[in-house]
Amino acid sequence: LSILLSLLVPAHTTRSPDCGGILTPSGLRYLAEVSKPHAESVLRRDLMAPPAPAPSPASPSSRNQIISVKVDKFSLTLIPDTGMRLSIEVDLGITSAPSATKEMRLSILADLHVDMNPEGNLELVTSDCKPTLEEVQSTEESDRSAPHKSSGLDMDKQINVEKICLEVSKLLLFPNERLMSLAAPFPITPSCQVQYLPLAAPMYSEQGIIISLQTTFQVAGTVIPLPVSPVPFSMPEPASSSPSHLILAFSEHFYTSLFSALEESGALNVSLLSSLTTATLAERITQMGSLFQEDLPVVLQTVTRSSPHVVLEEDKAIVKLFLTAQIGAGSALFQSFLSVNVDVAARLHLSVADTRMIISVAAIEDVELSLATSDVGPIMAALLEELFLPTIREEVPAQINKVLRQGVFLPHIASFTYTDVNITIHKDYVLIPCNLQLEARTG
């Protein structure tokens, strides 16, 4: 694995990437493909003047009028270490007299790159643009075979190729407003949000456009401090050219930070309803009988006693939770009689729906229970497990899955979603190759 993302960011104690992505050459081709109809619409609007009132015979204004605009070629290619090249060829149909028409070809060659502005937002910048205008054929010419440079200045003035070059980036479907949407905050739970912040302008390699991101989490609108990863995340370079449009990568530290944010928001503090009652417990723990006069359902109220931790191995993701369960009874007035430390190691299942990563607890792999405090005398470890392990094994995954049921938004730009997703879990990181899909417009 070669280090790509770490090259983007100087060593810094507070700004360190924990995820990122590579937009591949095939992804660029897809963006060009879906931008082509958009570009044709924009050029048609800009170049074709609205129908004007019928001019007088003496008026020269009817001499040249663009009557059709068709984008014949629209391509985006990668220029390693530099940026992207946008190549456009547009066929124009022009009337130069009531019965005479001619076709011209407008060719645009523009070099683009994504920069980071002083506000920290990514923006598309045009570094070079070369427009040319050629006459292809005319009804007034006998030889229509070969295109040649147009010598008429009228069309140059009417088309205003310089203005087209100044605004060439708007011909793409991801203008700066959409690039800025990459860094928008996304909800995880009602009180917890995630935000992906670009750390630097992207890099350009033969594999694609590489961007490094730092994740921040907000709880109740405030960014929470999270431990910085001791090892800066490095984007793994694909072994070969990937057929996927985009490859997202997330470090082990990202997942640990996510669960730490959920802990900070209180989302992991849950109540687990047991199938036990105070009467059934009294049959096994004799001192229970003197505490409760009526038969009440037993509840386990769990709180985190230290930060969770996620471990990524080949084909396996494990979250380790360190909880304390207050075991008690009473709905209106909860009365605790036991406190148990619960250490859980649970396997995570990862999938993607639209632009969200769905994280769920697939199975609990290991649970350790130890008595912390007791108001009903000493209790053997074996009895603790017999009484409470079934509830913990069933309810802890159910409650965490309930917290994460909405999923965690992936880095994405507005109007695009992800398809053909293939998630692979490796030691220390997760790779998500996927394809882009332009969402259908509604309304």
Language-model regions, residue ranges each:
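Alpha-helical bundle protein-protein interaction modules that mediate dimerization/oligomerization
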Residues: 95-97, 102-103, 117-132
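Extended, low-charge, aliphatic-rich alpha-helical segments
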Residues: 1-93, 97-99, 105, 135-443
